[in-house]
Amino acid sequence: MSFLDQILAAKQAEIAAARRLRPQADLERLAAKRDDFRGFAAALARPGVRIIAEIKRASPSLGDIRPDLDPADLAAAYEAGGAAALSVLTEPAFFKGSTKDLKRARAVTELPVLRKDFILDPYQVYETAAMGADAMLLIVRILDDDALASLTALAQGIGLECLVEIHDKADARRILDLAPPVVGINNRDLAHFRTDTSQAARLANRLPRGSAPVAASGIHSADDIRQALASGPRRFLIGEALVKAPNPAELLRQWTSLKVSEVGGRNPE
């Protein structure tokens, strides 16, 4: 069984347990009361290098990264460094994330917050809104076409935005009609957790017209960003390097100060 299969099996069990503890109707009522959504796509649309800075305690491929991190402190540092948005892992079994991490991070900043998890069920969409997130991750690889379309529509209907994640050409073809405003291109193969940092550049020009590409995974340095800018996106989702950094705010300042026009590549926008 692959890492991804293990994660999805655990997630199905987690959803079933959550339903027993809290009916979906309760979450629907909380979601309906939300009037404080922060614009996720709008934050990424601004000029220059835009970074979604991630709060992540652990991962299946790396094990513990920084299990004792303070999500509020890290979120404040990310905002001070010029992050465009936050991404917070809420998956507990493999990434040691939690709803509490997301709530604590969002409470101390004005940045839009992406819930990073394995969303499979409408229950989780309402749960995402109820916990205070502004956007959620939808991974094309783990959803069939009907589920992808219905979860996207449900999210939009209650005010949530989506980052729709692809990994290869087949995924890219599947979202042509959906045309999501923001598309994450994961350089990491979720089945085996192998990373190929050239993947985002190869797929950026295969996206639907109007979809903003975000490169995710394997970005650790200014050189990585320069290389990506030369032929691909100017938006990045970065976690491990920032979580490990002694001064994440300063690192973000360095990265976001890079000039897209100075790279001289064929950015797909």
Where do the PLM segments sit?
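An N-cap/entry alpha-helix motif that binds or orients negatively charged groups
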Residues: 2-68
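Conserved, mostly hydrophobic/aromatic
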Residues: 7, 53, 78, 86, ...
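Active-site beta-loop-alpha junctions enriched in small/polar residues
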Residues: 10, 56-58, 91, 118-119, ...
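N-terminal active-site wall of soluble small-molecule enzyme domains
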Residues: 55, 61-163, 169-174, 200-203
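Catalytic cores of alpha/beta
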Residues: 120-132, 167-178, 215, 219-238, ...
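Glycine-rich phosphate-binding active-site loops on the catalytic face of alpha/beta enzymes
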Residues: 127-147, 185-193, 231-252
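Catalytic-face loop-and-helix region of soluble metabolic enzyme cores
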Residues: 182-224, 229-238
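C-terminal helical cap(s) of enzyme catalytic domains, especially alpha/beta-barrels
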Residues: 202-206, 229, 242-263
